[in-house]
Amino acid sequence: MRPELSQYKHLSAGKVREIYEIDDKHILMVASDRISAYDFILDTEIPDKGRVLTAMSQFFFDTIDFPNHLAGPADDPRIPEEVLGRAMVCKKLNMLPFECVVRGYLTGSGLVEYKQTSSVCGVELPEGLVESSQLPEPIFTPATKADIGDHDINVSFDVVEERLGEARANQLRDASIAIYKAAAEIARERGVILADTKFEFGIDEDGTLVLGDEVLTPDSSRYWPLEGYEAGSVQPSFDKQFVRNWLTGPKSGWDKDSGLEPPALPGSVVEATRERYIEAYELISGQKFCQWIGSCV
């Protein structure tokens, strides 16, 4: 259910977030407990998910040395009490039309493409890689942004260059890989593998490239436990892959290619997903989720 914030104008709704206008330079970004999978927004929500996403984004925005769109603290007085802990005050940006995906490990759609072409988004990879193989170096594999219900489409770097120009495309690629490497090092020090992630960038009024949207959350990233990692099999995860696996498993009775809406998640899957999201936040940030604003009340 969308929060009714009478003091602000509602601008748009995404799969997970609601955007409100604060003034001509700032927006309020509110993370709901909705969860999406296979381009569907599920009927079942995950309690506290929006707070975890906001807490995780806040942690990395504060930690990673790169311009970002945050324009106030987590307890900014411009955030209404009813969404405190799941909302951020952000600068308005001219968002760039690409999902900036960085992969350090081979899995998901990247693995499917690799098996067909020995490459991912035009990036040639060595022979012999298997599910969950670590790549020699992280690779930039952009995708076009899709409307709700449509698939993001993986594209080659040439497409980004054609759309944005060589200089901006190079800046986008280099920034994405640098941020991924910094975050992956932080995660690894805490016993977690950052397998891949996606970023969104925008341009501010000064022409500066700025990191926007959410960043390095369990929604936008694949996180695996370092302990027990072994290439060649699907890894346990701290992200929504758990939901994807249940939906495509025998217990759901659902075929993702059927065109039908997915079923409701059972309580056990909801609680296990909530626990995984919270565990990811606590492991990587080193902070207790109960200490985050609006949690454990």
UniProtKB/Swiss-Prot annotation:
<protein>
    <recommendedName>
        <fullName>Phosphoribosylaminoimidazole-succinocarboxamide synthase</fullName>
        <ecNumber>6.3.2.6</ecNumber>
    </recommendedName>
</protein>
<keyword id="KW-0658">Purine biosynthesis</keyword>
<comment type="pathway">
    <text>Purine metabolism; IMP biosynthesis via de novo pathway; 5-amino-1-(5-phospho-D-ribosyl)imidazole-4-carboxamide from 5-amino-1-(5-phospho-D-ribosyl)imidazole-4-carboxylate: step 1/2.</text>
</comment>
<dbReference type="InterPro" id="IPR001636">
    <property type="entry name" value="SAICAR_synth"/>
</dbReference>
<dbReference type="GO" id="GO:0006189">
    <property type="term" value="P:'de novo' IMP biosynthetic process"/>
</dbReference>
<dbReference type="GO" id="GO:0005524">
    <property type="term" value="F:ATP binding"/>
</dbReference>
<dbReference type="Pfam" id="PF01259">
    <property type="entry name" value="SAICAR_synt"/>
</dbReference>
<keyword id="KW-0547">Nucleotide-binding</keyword>
<keyword id="KW-0067">ATP-binding</keyword>
<dbReference type="GO" id="GO:0005737">
    <property type="term" value="C:cytoplasm"/>
</dbReference>
<dbReference type="InterPro" id="IPR028923">
    <property type="entry name" value="SAICAR_synt/ADE2_N"/>
</dbReference>
<dbReference type="InterPro" id="IPR018236">
    <property type="entry name" value="SAICAR_synthetase_CS"/>
</dbReference>
<dbReference type="GO" id="GO:0004639">
    <property type="term" value="F:phosphoribosylaminoimidazolesuccinocarboxamide synthase activity"/>
</dbReference>
<keyword id="KW-0436">Ligase</keyword>
<comment type="similarity">
    <text>Belongs to the SAICAR synthetase family.</text>
</comment>
